[in-house]
Amino acid sequence: MNDTSKNILLSDVQGQGFLSIFNDLSSELMPHELSLLELMEGLDYNGFDSSLKRDASVDPKDMAIIIVYSYIMGHTSSRSIERLCRRDLFIVSVLRGIPAPDHTTINRFIKRNGKQIEDLFYQVVNKLGDIGELGRETVFQDGTKIESRAGKYTFVWKGFVEKNADKCEARLRKLLRTSNRLGLSMLCEEGLDFTSVYTELLDVKCRIEDLGLDLDAPAGRGRRLDPKVKLYRLVSEDLRKIRDYDEAIAMIGENRKSMSKTDPDATFMRMKEDAMMNGQLKPAYNLQCASDSNYIVGCTISCDRTDYETCIPMMEKLDQKLGWKYSNYCADSGYDTVRNFNYLEKNGYTPYIKPQDWEIAKTRRYMNDIGKYQNMEYNRDEDFFVCANGRKIARVGSGVDKKSGSSYGVYRSCESCEGCPLKEKCMKTSKKESKEFQAYMEHWDLRKKARDLLESDKGVEIRVNRSIMAEGSFAQMKGNNKLRRFSSFGIERAFTE
Protein backbone atom coordinates (compact mmCIF):
# COMPACT_ATOMS: atom_id res chain seq x y z
CA MET A 1 0.00 0.00 0.00
CA ASN A 2 1.40 3.38 -0.98
CA ASP A 3 2.09 5.95 1.73
CA THR A 4 0.16 8.92 0.35
CA SER A 5 1.54 11.26 3.02
CA LYS A 6 4.90 11.25 1.16
CA ASN A 7 3.21 12.81 -1.84
CA ILE A 8 2.42 16.07 -0.03
CA LEU A 9 5.44 18.34 0.46
CA LEU A 10 4.63 21.23 2.80
CA SER A 11 7.89 23.17 2.84
CA ASP A 12 10.79 23.91 0.57
CA VAL A 13 14.25 25.29 1.28
CA GLN A 14 12.86 28.74 2.18
CA GLY A 15 10.06 27.42 4.39
CA GLN A 16 7.46 28.28 1.76
CA GLY A 17 4.29 26.17 1.90
CA PHE A 18 3.30 24.49 -1.36
CA LEU A 19 1.54 21.46 -2.80
CA SER A 20 2.82 18.84 -5.29
CA ILE A 21 0.50 16.66 -7.35
CA PHE A 22 1.68 13.13 -8.11
CA ASN A 23 0.37 10.39 -10.36
CA ASP A 24 -1.68 8.53 -7.75
CA LEU A 25 -3.67 11.68 -6.92
CA SER A 26 -3.94 12.84 -10.53
CA SER A 27 -5.92 9.73 -11.37
CA GLU A 28 -8.57 10.81 -8.85
CA LEU A 29 -8.95 14.39 -10.09
CA MET A 30 -10.39 16.06 -13.17
CA PRO A 31 -7.98 18.02 -15.40
CA HIS A 32 -9.45 21.40 -14.44
CA GLU A 33 -9.12 20.51 -10.74
CA LEU A 34 -5.49 19.57 -11.30
CA SER A 35 -4.87 22.91 -12.99
CA LEU A 36 -6.33 24.81 -10.04
CA LEU A 37 -4.27 22.83 -7.54
CA GLU A 38 -1.08 23.35 -9.51
CA LEU A 39 -1.86 27.06 -9.44
CA MET A 40 -1.67 26.92 -5.63
CA GLU A 41 1.95 25.79 -5.69
CA GLY A 42 4.41 28.37 -4.45
CA LEU A 43 1.87 30.70 -2.82
CA ASP A 44 2.76 32.45 0.43
CA TYR A 45 0.73 31.11 3.38
CA ASN A 46 2.85 32.69 6.11
CA GLY A 47 0.34 35.46 6.79
CA PHE A 48 -2.13 32.95 8.21
CA ASP A 49 0.09 32.34 11.24
CA SER A 50 -0.39 35.84 12.66
CA SER A 51 -4.10 35.42 13.43
CA LEU A 52 -3.83 32.24 15.51
CA LYS A 53 -3.76 32.92 19.25
CA ARG A 54 -2.87 29.37 20.31
CA ASP A 55 -1.22 26.26 18.94
CA ALA A 56 -3.51 24.36 16.59
CA SER A 57 -3.40 20.72 15.58
CA VAL A 58 -3.72 21.62 11.88
CA ASP A 59 -1.06 23.89 10.45
CA PRO A 60 -2.45 27.18 9.04
CA LYS A 61 -0.89 26.41 5.66
CA ASP A 62 -2.64 23.05 5.54
CA MET A 63 -5.93 24.62 6.66
CA ALA A 64 -5.73 27.24 3.89
CA ILE A 65 -5.11 24.53 1.29
CA ILE A 66 -8.02 22.45 2.64
CA ILE A 67 -10.48 25.37 2.57
CA VAL A 68 -9.51 26.54 -0.93
CA TYR A 69 -9.67 22.98 -2.23
CA SER A 70 -13.09 22.44 -0.60
CA TYR A 71 -14.49 25.58 -2.24
CA ILE A 72 -13.09 24.39 -5.58
CA MET A 73 -14.99 21.13 -5.09
CA GLY A 74 -18.20 23.02 -4.29
CA HIS A 75 -18.26 22.59 -0.49
CA THR A 76 -18.78 26.00 1.11
CA SER A 77 -20.31 25.34 4.54
CA SER A 78 -18.05 24.49 7.49
CA ARG A 79 -19.96 21.27 8.23
CA SER A 80 -19.66 20.17 4.60
CA ILE A 81 -15.91 20.86 4.69
CA GLU A 82 -15.62 18.82 7.90
CA ARG A 83 -17.29 15.83 6.21
CA LEU A 84 -14.99 16.24 3.19
CA CYS A 85 -11.93 16.17 5.47
CA ARG A 86 -12.92 12.67 6.63
CA ARG A 87 -13.64 11.22 3.18
CA ASP A 88 -11.50 12.92 0.53
CA LEU A 89 -8.20 11.18 -0.25
CA PHE A 90 -6.47 14.41 -1.16
CA ILE A 91 -7.34 16.18 2.13
CA VAL A 92 -6.46 13.06 4.15
CA SER A 93 -3.03 13.18 2.52
CA VAL A 94 -2.66 16.87 3.36
CA LEU A 95 -3.53 16.20 7.02
CA ARG A 96 -0.83 13.45 7.23
CA GLY A 97 -2.63 11.46 9.90
CA ILE A 98 -3.77 14.47 11.94
CA PRO A 99 -7.44 14.27 13.01
CA ALA A 100 -9.78 16.18 10.72
CA PRO A 101 -10.71 19.67 12.03
CA ASP A 102 -14.30 20.11 13.16
CA HIS A 103 -16.65 22.72 11.73
CA THR A 104 -16.09 25.21 14.57
CA THR A 105 -12.32 25.18 13.95
CA ILE A 106 -12.87 25.72 10.22
CA ASN A 107 -15.36 28.53 10.81
CA ARG A 108 -13.07 30.22 13.35
CA PHE A 109 -10.13 30.02 10.95
CA ILE A 110 -12.11 31.68 8.14
CA LYS A 111 -13.39 34.36 10.52
CA ARG A 112 -9.89 35.25 11.76
CA ASN A 113 -8.16 35.15 8.38
CA GLY A 114 -10.33 37.34 6.15
CA LYS A 115 -7.45 39.61 5.10
CA GLN A 116 -5.11 36.65 4.52
CA ILE A 117 -7.71 34.89 2.35
CA GLU A 118 -8.07 38.06 0.27
CA ASP A 119 -4.27 38.24 -0.06
CA LEU A 120 -4.22 34.61 -1.23
CA PHE A 121 -6.77 35.52 -3.91
CA TYR A 122 -4.56 38.32 -5.27
CA GLN A 123 -1.52 36.02 -5.20
CA VAL A 124 -3.42 33.71 -7.53
CA VAL A 125 -4.35 36.65 -9.78
CA ASN A 126 -0.72 37.79 -9.98
CA LYS A 127 0.38 34.26 -10.80
CA LEU A 128 -2.23 34.06 -13.58
CA GLY A 129 -0.79 37.27 -14.98
CA ASP A 130 2.77 35.95 -14.82
CA ILE A 131 1.95 32.76 -16.74
CA GLY A 132 0.16 34.70 -19.49
CA GLU A 133 -3.46 33.85 -18.71
CA LEU A 134 -4.50 37.52 -18.44
CA GLY A 135 -4.49 40.18 -21.13
CA ARG A 136 -3.43 42.90 -18.62
CA GLU A 137 -4.68 45.62 -20.99
CA THR A 138 -8.43 46.14 -20.38
CA VAL A 139 -10.30 45.61 -17.13
CA PHE A 140 -14.09 45.18 -17.08
CA GLN A 141 -16.09 46.11 -13.98
CA ASP A 142 -19.67 45.36 -13.05
CA GLY A 143 -21.68 44.84 -9.87
CA THR A 144 -24.44 42.62 -8.58
CA LYS A 145 -26.63 42.59 -5.48
CA ILE A 146 -26.45 39.57 -3.20
CA GLU A 147 -28.91 39.18 -0.35
CA SER A 148 -27.70 39.43 3.23
CA ARG A 149 -28.36 36.78 5.86
CA ALA A 150 -30.68 39.24 7.64
CA GLY A 151 -34.44 38.80 7.39
CA LYS A 152 -36.62 40.67 4.88
CA TYR A 153 -38.61 42.52 7.53
CA THR A 154 -35.78 43.79 9.77
CA PHE A 155 -35.67 47.18 8.06
CA VAL A 156 -34.83 50.48 9.75
CA TRP A 157 -35.62 53.53 7.60
CA LYS A 158 -33.53 56.63 8.17
CA GLY A 159 -36.37 59.04 7.35
CA PHE A 160 -38.70 57.34 9.81
CA VAL A 161 -36.04 57.38 12.54
CA GLU A 162 -35.29 61.07 11.97
CA LYS A 163 -39.01 61.89 12.10
CA ASN A 164 -39.42 60.04 15.41
CA ALA A 165 -36.26 61.67 16.78
CA ASP A 166 -37.72 65.13 16.05
CA LYS A 167 -40.95 64.18 17.84
CA CYS A 168 -38.98 62.83 20.79
CA GLU A 169 -36.95 66.05 20.97
CA ALA A 170 -40.16 68.10 21.07
CA ARG A 171 -41.50 65.91 23.91
CA LEU A 172 -38.28 66.32 25.90
CA ARG A 173 -38.43 70.09 25.54
CA LYS A 174 -42.01 69.96 26.83
CA LEU A 175 -40.89 67.79 29.77
CA LEU A 176 -38.24 70.37 30.64
CA ARG A 177 -40.96 72.99 30.94
CA THR A 178 -42.90 70.59 33.17
CA SER A 179 -39.84 70.12 35.40
CA ASN A 180 -39.60 73.91 35.71
CA ARG A 181 -43.19 74.05 36.97
CA LEU A 182 -42.43 71.33 39.54
CA GLY A 183 -39.39 73.22 40.79
CA LEU A 184 -36.89 70.59 39.61
CA SER A 185 -35.15 72.87 37.12
CA MET A 186 -34.59 76.57 36.60
CA LEU A 187 -33.37 76.33 33.01
CA CYS A 188 -35.52 78.09 30.40
CA GLU A 189 -36.14 75.86 27.38
CA GLU A 190 -36.60 78.62 24.80
CA GLY A 191 -33.56 79.26 22.62
CA LEU A 192 -31.56 76.32 24.03
CA ASP A 193 -29.83 73.79 21.83
CA PHE A 194 -30.93 70.20 22.33
CA THR A 195 -27.63 69.13 23.93
CA SER A 196 -28.26 71.52 26.84
CA VAL A 197 -31.86 70.26 27.16
CA TYR A 198 -30.64 66.65 27.20
CA THR A 199 -28.00 67.36 29.86
CA GLU A 200 -30.47 69.25 32.06
CA LEU A 201 -33.02 66.43 31.90
CA LEU A 202 -30.35 63.95 32.97
CA ASP A 203 -29.77 66.16 36.01
CA VAL A 204 -33.53 66.36 36.63
CA LYS A 205 -33.70 62.57 36.55
CA CYS A 206 -30.92 62.33 39.16
CA ARG A 207 -32.64 64.93 41.38
CA ILE A 208 -35.88 62.91 41.38
CA GLU A 209 -33.95 59.76 42.30
CA ASP A 210 -32.41 61.62 45.28
CA LEU A 211 -35.88 62.55 46.60
CA GLY A 212 -36.47 58.98 47.79
CA LEU A 213 -39.83 58.57 46.05
CA ASP A 214 -41.28 55.18 45.17
CA LEU A 215 -40.32 55.18 41.48
CA ASP A 216 -41.78 51.68 40.95
CA ALA A 217 -45.21 52.53 42.35
CA PRO A 218 -48.03 50.81 40.41
CA ALA A 219 -50.11 52.98 38.10
CA GLY A 220 -53.67 52.55 36.90
CA ARG A 221 -57.28 53.23 37.83
CA GLY A 222 -57.71 54.26 41.46
CA ARG A 223 -54.02 55.07 41.92
CA ARG A 224 -52.75 58.61 41.71
CA LEU A 225 -49.08 58.85 40.80
CA ASP A 226 -46.89 61.59 42.19
CA PRO A 227 -46.29 64.14 39.35
CA LYS A 228 -42.54 63.84 39.90
CA VAL A 229 -42.67 60.04 39.56
CA LYS A 230 -44.70 60.40 36.37
CA LEU A 231 -42.19 62.95 35.06
CA TYR A 232 -39.32 60.59 35.93
CA ARG A 233 -40.84 57.74 33.94
CA LEU A 234 -41.56 59.89 30.88
CA VAL A 235 -38.09 61.45 30.92
CA SER A 236 -36.39 58.04 31.33
CA GLU A 237 -38.33 56.54 28.41
CA ASP A 238 -37.72 59.44 26.02
CA LEU A 239 -34.02 59.73 26.92
CA ARG A 240 -33.64 56.03 26.12
CA LYS A 241 -35.49 56.45 22.84
CA ILE A 242 -33.43 59.45 21.72
CA ARG A 243 -30.24 57.47 22.40
CA ASP A 244 -31.55 54.58 20.30
CA TYR A 245 -32.49 56.96 17.47
CA ASP A 246 -29.06 58.61 17.52
CA GLU A 247 -27.33 55.21 17.42
CA ALA A 248 -29.49 54.08 14.48
CA ILE A 249 -28.81 57.28 12.50
CA ALA A 250 -25.07 56.96 13.19
CA MET A 251 -25.04 53.32 12.01
CA ILE A 252 -26.97 54.14 8.82
CA GLY A 253 -24.59 56.99 7.98
CA GLU A 254 -24.88 59.84 5.50
CA ASN A 255 -24.83 57.86 2.24
CA ARG A 256 -27.57 55.35 3.10
CA LYS A 257 -31.28 55.54 3.80
CA SER A 258 -31.83 52.17 5.47
CA MET A 259 -30.23 49.28 7.32
CA SER A 260 -31.18 45.93 8.84
CA LYS A 261 -31.65 45.45 12.58
CA THR A 262 -29.86 42.10 12.58
CA ASP A 263 -27.17 43.10 10.05
CA PRO A 264 -26.52 46.87 10.29
CA ASP A 265 -24.01 46.79 7.41
CA ALA A 266 -26.68 45.62 4.93
CA THR A 267 -28.78 48.11 2.95
CA PHE A 268 -32.27 47.45 1.63
CA MET A 269 -32.17 47.26 -2.17
CA ARG A 270 -34.46 46.21 -4.97
CA MET A 271 -33.41 42.76 -6.18
CA LYS A 272 -33.68 41.75 -9.83
CA GLU A 273 -34.61 38.13 -9.12
CA ASP A 274 -37.69 38.97 -7.08
CA ALA A 275 -40.18 36.10 -7.33
CA MET A 276 -43.19 38.43 -7.12
CA MET A 277 -41.83 40.62 -9.93
CA ASN A 278 -42.61 43.76 -7.92
CA GLY A 279 -39.13 44.83 -6.85
CA GLN A 280 -39.42 43.80 -3.21
CA LEU A 281 -36.80 45.42 -0.99
CA LYS A 282 -34.36 43.03 0.67
CA PRO A 283 -31.22 43.59 2.79
CA ALA A 284 -28.27 43.11 0.47
CA TYR A 285 -24.70 44.03 -0.39
CA ASN A 286 -23.34 45.46 -3.62
CA LEU A 287 -20.63 43.05 -4.81
CA GLN A 288 -18.26 44.49 -7.43
CA CYS A 289 -16.04 42.35 -9.67
CA ALA A 290 -13.26 43.34 -12.06
CA SER A 291 -12.64 40.85 -14.88
CA ASP A 292 -9.92 40.20 -17.41
CA SER A 293 -9.83 37.33 -19.92
CA ASN A 294 -12.75 35.63 -18.14
CA TYR A 295 -10.92 35.68 -14.80
CA ILE A 296 -11.98 37.70 -11.77
CA VAL A 297 -8.96 39.91 -10.98
CA GLY A 298 -10.48 42.13 -8.29
CA CYS A 299 -13.38 42.20 -5.87
CA THR A 300 -14.89 44.78 -3.51
CA ILE A 301 -18.09 44.97 -1.49
CA SER A 302 -20.12 47.97 -0.36
CA CYS A 303 -23.47 49.07 1.05
CA ASP A 304 -24.20 51.41 -1.89
CA ARG A 305 -27.44 50.81 -3.78
CA THR A 306 -25.87 52.15 -7.00
CA ASP A 307 -22.53 51.69 -8.75
CA TYR A 308 -21.59 55.39 -8.84
CA GLU A 309 -19.13 55.28 -5.92
CA THR A 310 -17.61 51.84 -6.58
CA CYS A 311 -15.27 52.56 -9.50
CA ILE A 312 -12.56 54.48 -7.61
CA PRO A 313 -12.23 51.99 -4.68
CA MET A 314 -11.92 49.12 -7.17
CA MET A 315 -9.17 50.77 -9.22
CA GLU A 316 -7.28 51.82 -6.09
CA LYS A 317 -7.33 48.21 -4.88
CA LEU A 318 -6.12 46.89 -8.24
CA ASP A 319 -3.26 49.39 -8.25
CA GLN A 320 -2.31 48.28 -4.75
CA LYS A 321 -2.63 44.50 -5.18
CA LEU A 322 -1.63 43.73 -8.77
CA GLY A 323 1.86 43.79 -10.24
CA TRP A 324 0.77 45.67 -13.36
CA LYS A 325 -1.46 48.55 -14.37
CA TYR A 326 -4.32 48.38 -16.86
CA SER A 327 -4.49 50.93 -19.66
CA ASN A 328 -8.22 50.62 -20.48
CA TYR A 329 -11.28 50.59 -18.22
CA CYS A 330 -14.71 49.43 -19.40
CA ALA A 331 -18.03 49.59 -17.54
CA ASP A 332 -21.72 50.11 -18.19
CA SER A 333 -23.75 53.29 -17.71
CA GLY A 334 -24.02 52.74 -13.96
CA TYR A 335 -20.51 54.18 -13.61
CA ASP A 336 -21.16 57.27 -15.74
CA THR A 337 -20.21 60.11 -13.37
CA VAL A 338 -17.86 63.07 -13.68
CA ARG A 339 -15.93 61.95 -10.60
CA ASN A 340 -15.16 58.55 -12.18
CA PHE A 341 -14.17 60.04 -15.55
CA ASN A 342 -11.82 62.55 -13.93
CA TYR A 343 -10.20 59.93 -11.70
CA LEU A 344 -9.59 57.51 -14.58
CA GLU A 345 -8.12 60.15 -16.88
CA LYS A 346 -5.95 61.57 -14.10
CA ASN A 347 -4.50 58.12 -13.35
CA GLY A 348 -3.76 57.19 -16.95
CA TYR A 349 -6.77 55.00 -17.80
CA THR A 350 -8.75 55.28 -21.03
CA PRO A 351 -12.41 55.20 -19.89
CA TYR A 352 -14.74 53.15 -22.10
CA ILE A 353 -17.87 53.93 -20.06
CA LYS A 354 -21.25 53.83 -21.78
CA PRO A 355 -23.14 57.14 -21.26
CA GLN A 356 -26.53 56.89 -19.57
CA ASP A 357 -28.20 58.41 -22.63
CA TRP A 358 -26.47 56.01 -25.04
CA GLU A 359 -29.64 54.27 -26.20
CA ILE A 360 -32.22 57.03 -25.81
CA ALA A 361 -30.04 59.55 -27.66
CA LYS A 362 -30.44 57.45 -30.82
CA THR A 363 -34.25 57.69 -30.83
CA ARG A 364 -36.09 60.06 -33.15
CA ARG A 365 -38.16 61.47 -30.30
CA TYR A 366 -35.02 62.49 -28.39
CA MET A 367 -33.30 64.05 -31.39
CA ASN A 368 -36.43 66.04 -32.37
CA ASP A 369 -37.08 67.41 -28.86
CA ILE A 370 -36.30 71.13 -29.23
CA GLY A 371 -36.63 71.67 -25.47
CA LYS A 372 -33.45 69.71 -24.64
CA TYR A 373 -30.29 71.76 -24.41
CA GLN A 374 -28.39 68.90 -26.10
CA ASN A 375 -30.30 69.73 -29.32
CA MET A 376 -29.73 73.51 -29.12
CA GLU A 377 -26.99 75.52 -30.75
CA TYR A 378 -24.29 76.35 -28.19
CA ASN A 379 -21.80 79.23 -28.27
CA ARG A 380 -18.85 77.95 -26.23
CA ASP A 381 -16.88 81.21 -26.31
CA GLU A 382 -19.63 83.36 -24.79
CA ASP A 383 -21.36 80.48 -22.95
CA PHE A 384 -24.95 80.76 -24.16
CA PHE A 385 -27.49 78.64 -26.04
CA VAL A 386 -29.72 79.58 -28.95
CA CYS A 387 -33.21 78.04 -28.89
CA ALA A 388 -35.16 76.78 -31.91
CA ASN A 389 -36.78 80.22 -32.29
CA GLY A 390 -33.40 81.97 -32.41
CA ARG A 391 -33.57 83.50 -28.92
CA LYS A 392 -30.53 83.72 -26.67
CA ILE A 393 -30.46 81.66 -23.44
CA ALA A 394 -27.65 83.01 -21.23
CA ARG A 395 -26.00 81.63 -18.11
CA VAL A 396 -27.27 83.16 -14.85
CA GLY A 397 -25.82 80.83 -12.19
CA SER A 398 -23.96 77.61 -11.41
CA GLY A 399 -23.81 74.76 -8.90
CA VAL A 400 -22.40 71.31 -8.13
CA ASP A 401 -24.39 68.08 -7.88
CA LYS A 402 -23.48 66.54 -4.50
CA LYS A 403 -24.30 63.01 -5.60
CA SER A 404 -22.31 62.82 -8.84
CA GLY A 405 -19.81 65.64 -8.30
CA SER A 406 -20.78 67.19 -11.63
CA SER A 407 -20.85 70.97 -12.00
CA TYR A 408 -23.73 72.57 -13.87
CA GLY A 409 -24.79 75.95 -15.15
CA VAL A 410 -28.21 77.56 -14.79
CA TYR A 411 -29.40 79.10 -18.06
CA ARG A 412 -32.38 81.40 -18.60
CA SER A 413 -33.86 83.00 -21.70
CA CYS A 414 -33.04 86.70 -22.07
CA GLU A 415 -36.55 87.37 -23.40
CA SER A 416 -39.99 86.33 -22.29
CA CYS A 417 -41.30 83.21 -24.01
CA GLU A 418 -44.91 84.42 -23.93
CA GLY A 419 -46.33 84.41 -27.43
CA CYS A 420 -43.59 82.17 -28.83
CA PRO A 421 -45.10 79.75 -31.39
CA LEU A 422 -42.76 76.96 -30.21
CA LYS A 423 -43.45 77.33 -26.48
CA GLU A 424 -45.74 74.29 -26.26
CA LYS A 425 -43.06 72.05 -27.79
CA CYS A 426 -40.14 73.65 -25.96
CA MET A 427 -41.73 74.11 -22.49
CA LYS A 428 -44.15 71.20 -22.35
CA THR A 429 -44.91 71.12 -18.62
CA SER A 430 -43.22 74.27 -17.36
CA LYS A 431 -45.45 77.18 -16.30
CA LYS A 432 -42.61 79.69 -16.10
CA GLU A 433 -42.60 82.84 -18.18
CA SER A 434 -39.25 82.11 -19.85
CA LYS A 435 -37.17 79.04 -20.68
CA GLU A 436 -34.86 77.91 -17.86
CA PHE A 437 -32.77 74.75 -17.39
CA GLN A 438 -29.64 73.28 -15.82
CA ALA A 439 -26.92 72.22 -18.26
CA TYR A 440 -24.20 69.81 -17.14
CA MET A 441 -21.59 71.00 -19.61
CA GLU A 442 -18.61 69.20 -18.02
CA HIS A 443 -20.50 65.90 -18.04
CA TRP A 444 -21.75 66.61 -21.56
CA ASP A 445 -18.18 67.00 -22.85
CA LEU A 446 -17.02 63.84 -21.07
CA ARG A 447 -19.95 61.86 -22.49
CA LYS A 448 -19.15 63.10 -25.98
CA LYS A 449 -15.54 61.97 -25.55
CA ALA A 450 -16.71 58.57 -24.23
CA ARG A 451 -19.12 58.20 -27.15
CA ASP A 452 -16.28 58.83 -29.62
CA LEU A 453 -14.14 56.20 -27.87
CA LEU A 454 -16.93 53.61 -27.88
CA GLU A 455 -17.66 54.16 -31.57
CA SER A 456 -14.01 53.65 -32.56
CA ASP A 457 -12.80 50.24 -33.77
CA LYS A 458 -11.13 49.56 -30.42
CA GLY A 459 -14.22 50.73 -28.56
CA VAL A 460 -16.54 48.44 -30.53
CA GLU A 461 -14.30 45.46 -29.75
CA ILE A 462 -14.23 46.30 -26.03
CA ARG A 463 -17.97 47.00 -25.92
CA VAL A 464 -18.78 43.64 -27.51
CA ASN A 465 -16.65 41.83 -24.92
CA ARG A 466 -18.00 43.76 -21.91
CA SER A 467 -21.06 41.62 -21.26
CA ILE A 468 -19.08 38.41 -21.80
CA MET A 469 -16.31 39.39 -19.40
CA ALA A 470 -18.30 41.17 -16.69
CA GLU A 471 -21.53 39.16 -16.61
CA GLY A 472 -19.67 35.86 -16.89
CA SER A 473 -18.18 36.31 -13.43
CA PHE A 474 -21.66 36.62 -11.91
CA ALA A 475 -22.83 33.55 -13.82
CA GLN A 476 -19.96 31.66 -12.20
CA MET A 477 -20.78 32.91 -8.69
CA LYS A 478 -24.57 32.86 -8.78
CA GLY A 479 -25.23 30.07 -11.25
CA ASN A 480 -22.42 27.57 -10.74
CA ASN A 481 -21.43 28.31 -7.13
CA LYS A 482 -25.04 29.03 -6.01
CA LEU A 483 -24.06 32.21 -4.17
CA ARG A 484 -27.50 33.80 -3.93
CA ARG A 485 -27.46 34.74 -0.26
CA PHE A 486 -24.65 35.24 2.22
CA SER A 487 -24.57 32.91 5.21
CA SER A 488 -22.66 35.30 7.50
CA PHE A 489 -23.53 38.58 9.19
CA GLY A 490 -21.46 41.72 8.62
CA ILE A 491 -19.80 43.20 5.55
CA GLU A 492 -16.35 41.75 6.34
CA ARG A 493 -17.59 38.16 6.75
CA ALA A 494 -19.75 38.53 3.63
CA PHE A 495 -16.74 39.73 1.63
CA THR A 496 -14.59 36.83 2.86
CA GLU A 497 -17.33 34.40 1.86
Give a label for each model feature.
Residues 5-6, 10, 56, 67, ...:
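Anion-binding and metal-coordination hotspots
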